[in-house]
Amino acid sequence: MPRRRVAAKREILDDPKYGSQILAKFMNHVMESGKKAVAERIVYGALDTVKARKNSDPLEIFEKALDAIAPLVEVKSRRVGGATYQVPVEVRPSRRNALAMRWLVDYARKRGEKSMALRLAGELLDAAEGKGAAVKKREDVHRMAEANKAFSHYRF
């Protein structure tokens, strides 16, 4: 931890097409090696595909998918005596979004479609419907927290 002061959070500018700050943050998660233009093309391509398939606002579907993926609780390791316990803790809102975006991108990359835009669109649509690998990850995390509920008195 820094000894001086906590660094101020930098303001993320809204994305140019939809004017959404969450979408701009998501593009930063998709971006690799600083290639923002490539990330924009992938995300906008995915949203266009979603719009073509569902005939509704792609930003609404994106936000619905993020809500379906974002975890409410997670487990953190806590060492007590000689044993390490998995202690369930509530996830703060900023971390909820960050985890949801990270899982969405990770599981989209593992899909089988040809282009990343199609993979991302597929994972977004699956997540919005409450299925898909990213939603399964959330359920696994919740299940893990539920299984370790007995250790919740070891708070951080």
UniProtKB/Swiss-Prot annotation:
GO terms for cellular component: small ribosomal subunit. It comes from Pseudomonas putida (strain ATCC 47054 / DSM 6125 / CFBP 8728 / NCIMB 11950 / KT2440). Belongs to the universal ribosomal protein uS7 family. InterPro entries: Ribosomal_uS7, Ribosomal_uS7_bac/org-type, Ribosomal_uS7_CS, Ribosomal_uS7_dom, Ribosomal_uS7_dom_sf. Pfam families: Ribosomal_S7. This is Small ribosomal subunit protein uS7. Keywords: Ribonucleoprotein, Ribosomal protein, RNA-binding, rRNA-binding, tRNA-binding. Coiled coil: none annotated. NCBIfam families: rpsG_bact. One of the primary rRNA binding proteins, it binds directly to 16S rRNA where it nucleates assembly of the head domain of the 30S subunit. Is located at the subunit interface close to the decoding center, probably blocks exit of the E-site tRNA. GO terms for biological process: translation. GO terms for molecular function: rRNA binding; structural constituent of ribosome; tRNA binding. Part of the 30S ribosomal subunit. Contacts proteins S9 and S11.
